[in-house]
Amino acid sequence: MFVRILNSEMELATGCTEPGAVALTAAEAGAALRKAGGTRVEAVTVRASINIIKNAMSAGIPGTSYQGMDYAAAIGAVGGDPVHLLEVMNYVPREQMEEAAALVKAGKVKVEVAQVPQKLYVEVVVTADGHTGRAVVRDLHTNVVLVEQDGVATLDKQHAGPAAAGDSDVVTPEQIAEFLTVRSIWDYCTEELDPLHDPIDIIRSAVQVNTTISNEGLSKEYGLAIGRNLELNCRKGLMTRDLTTNAMVIASAGADARMAGAPVSVVANSGSGNQGITATMPVVATARWLDIDEEKMLRAVTLSNLIAIRIKAKFGRLSNLCGATVAATGAACGIAYLLGGGYHEVCCTIQNMVGNITGMVCDGAKADCALKISTCVNAACQAAAMGVRGVRVQSTDGIVEHNVEYTLDNFATLSTNGTSDSVILDLMLNKHLPETD
């Protein structure tokens, strides 16, 4: 089940996953249009949930100077092949990219807010020659639930759950939340897993692919160039080049490249490339800094990604809170393990993370995501260093509880119910009593 969860929640993507989901939906609609008899796309209408619009508004389109969901929709509709899923824009020829850009500049692409209960919802309607194609993606970034040609459904799984609507190997958030605990993840990664022989290819890919995008981010001035600037600060003596700063440099550089639209793939975690980078690269950086062998590094990276997946299962695919805080909590656990920590120390590390960076808001996917990631990675290294010494935020403080699972549930509640004072106070006043032996 652990490998199935990893394969379900980790996948290749190019660029930000929200524009990717828009492009995929548009590609499905465009393909339906062509089957209905339409030729050259004349107009595109996108209706999406607020969270999708927020995260797609300022994100760069891979391999172009464009940004935003209108370009993603046009590119997907004009030249996208839905078989490529979240990498759909990677395979669109330059001529069709230019055709799509012309549609946007001519005002032929409209973006509207969809009044729907789902946080992840994209609907695209494409028209040409009196024909229409329509597609809907919902709940998961690649979960296509409806495709229509001239109003006639050729695929309709709107009343099915995400696993039924998409790949049969998809594991639902409810299944993940029920199966994964910090204890079960720890036992699997440290005792049951054989990293060199078990089929954890997605973890190996995450290390390789996300290292590539981090190196890309250090090679050029992408976005705010947080990784390169941290590196420069070290060379100038403004910062110390230590384990923590090294992890910050490597993780933020990957996000620099991704948010700027570098045409380089990433292995995402829970639908987010930045979370994939954040859950993987600080752990890889720490392992290499400490000269840790590959087997232990793979255990640590698996631990990190599974902890992030466990949190996101209740946190929500898209949220008002920054997903880097979730992924960095996973990274902190992986780092604590590499520093010699056991299960108790990993639990202390989680308590330190929730007691520190909880509440960082998500105000869209954009260049300064790399800045937030560097902050979260700094916190992760600090939390791990404290945790391996048994130092932890106490259950008398804030939303931290005596049991790490309750703490993570409180963390998720802030994501799903908002971060108002009333919600925070309610969590503080209604903590679980410690169990007695």
Residue ranges and their predicted role:
Residues 105-261, 425-437:
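Signature of multi-pass transmembrane helix bundles
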Residues 23-126:
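Early transmembrane hairpin of solute transport permeases
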Residues 36-43, 84-89, 111-112, 197-203, ...:
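Flexible, glycine/charged-enriched surface loops at secondary-structure junctions
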Residues 12-28, 264-281, 323-326:
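Conserved phosphate/anionic-ligand binding catalytic regions in large, soluble enzymes, centered on
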